[in-house]
Design a protein with these regions (language model features):
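Alpha-helix N-cap and loop-to-helix initiation/capping positions
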Residues: 23-31, 89-96, 240-251
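Generic structural signal for well-ordered alpha-helices
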Residues: 36-40, 63-67, 95-103, 131, ...
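Conserved, mostly hydrophobic/aromatic
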Residues: 8, 43, 52, 79, ...
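Metal-dependent polysaccharide deacetylase catalytic core of the NodB/CE4 family, i.e.
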Residues: 46-127, 139-140, 144-151, 172-173, ...
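Active-site-adjacent pocket scaffolds in enzyme catalytic domains
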Residues: 107, 111-114, 118-217
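Active-site beta->alpha N-cap acidic-glycine motif
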Residues: 1-72
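C-terminal domain-boundary segment and adjacent tail
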Residues: 45-46, 200-282
Length: 282
């Protein structure tokens, strides 16, 4: 079973939980270039391709990094412009943010951008109409709907496998690929395959659950470049955010290497090329 390997190309200070004002970003040390290059070298080592959801701000600051991702044969998607939460934006603000990121990425890559992932999975129930906007502007694959609730985002009860959304009675051709979870009940799903959850759980649990998932559907692993850099700056914040942001950063690289050696991975477009998907009213 081919699983999707995805990277959210953003810097440590873009994280919504840290809540660092955008006006301060330029005064902070960036780690996105060396960390992303490290991931690219790692993927070359294991001969695997991935989908890189690139934040417009990161692309604007490091256009050569985006070119290098393309040069090495990986798939490019948009992660928005400035890592603003979708549910905190009006439709006009969202469209402006989204189109700005698309313009930058298409100018750098010379390619049409067909994939999108919202910052922090932040498309909420009252913002589902942005999926129609994405489709109208050329997006074929979206990965923004998190099938479990957190204080920051998420939608309980939505499909856990790739699906075609039905929004306000309209069947979309866009395919939604949610982050991989193990569904325990209709209203409870167990995340394990990316970000903090990948760092939190022992590798044995991650591997066991992904194997179970692969009996019925493809999984998706997601990672941020800063997660393989245990030396990122420590921002002063409350204990919970500090725990989520910095817990077991030193474990990420080894876990990722084990996953790449044990499972088959590819970019989202390749994974979904032959995947049958269902319609689902969300």
């Amino acid at each position: 079973m081919l699983n999707a390997l995805t990277v959210d190309v953003e810097d440590w200070y873009h994280t919504n939980g840290l809540n660092i004002p955008q006006s301060e970003w330029r005064n902070l040390p960036s780690t996105v270039y060396p960390s992303t290059m490290k991931l690219l070298d790692l993927f070359d080592e294991f001969q695997v391709k991935a989908t890189f959801f690139v934040l417009g701000d990161a692309a604007q600051n490091f256009p050569l990094l985006v070119k290098e991702i393309v040069k090495r044969g990986h798939e490019i998607g948009s992660h928005g412009m400035n890592h603003q939460l979708v549910y905190c934006q009006s439709m006009e603000e969202f469209k402006k943010d989204f189109m700005a990121s698309i313009s930058i990425l298409e100018r750098i890559t010379g390619q049409k951008i067909r994939l999108y992932r919202a910052p922090s999975w932040s498309i909420s129930r009252d913002r589902l109409n942005v999926l129609s906007l994405l489709e109208e502007n050329g997006i074929h694959y979206d990965s923004s709907l998190q099938p479990f609730k957190t204080p920051l985002s998420g939608l309980s009860g939505i499909p856990v496998e790739p699906f075609n959304p039905v929004v306000e009675g309209k069947q979309l051709k866009l395919i939604e690929f949610p982050p991989t979870v193990m569904r325990i009940s209709e209203n409870f799903s167990f995340p394990f395959a990316g970000g903090f959850y990948l760092r939190f759980f022992p590798y044995s649990i991650v591997s066991y659950l992904l194997k179970k998932i692969n009996k019925v559907r493809p999984g998706m692993v997601y990672i941020h470049p800063w997660e393989i850099n245990p030396e990122i700056p420590r921002w002063k914040t409350n204990w919970m955010i500090h725990f989520i942001q910095y817990f077991r950063l030193r474990s990420t690289e080894q876990k990722l290497k084990r996953l790449l050696s044990e499972f088959d991975f590819g970019p989202i477009g390749e994974v979904l090329k032959y995947q049958e998907v269902m319609w689902s009213d969300i």
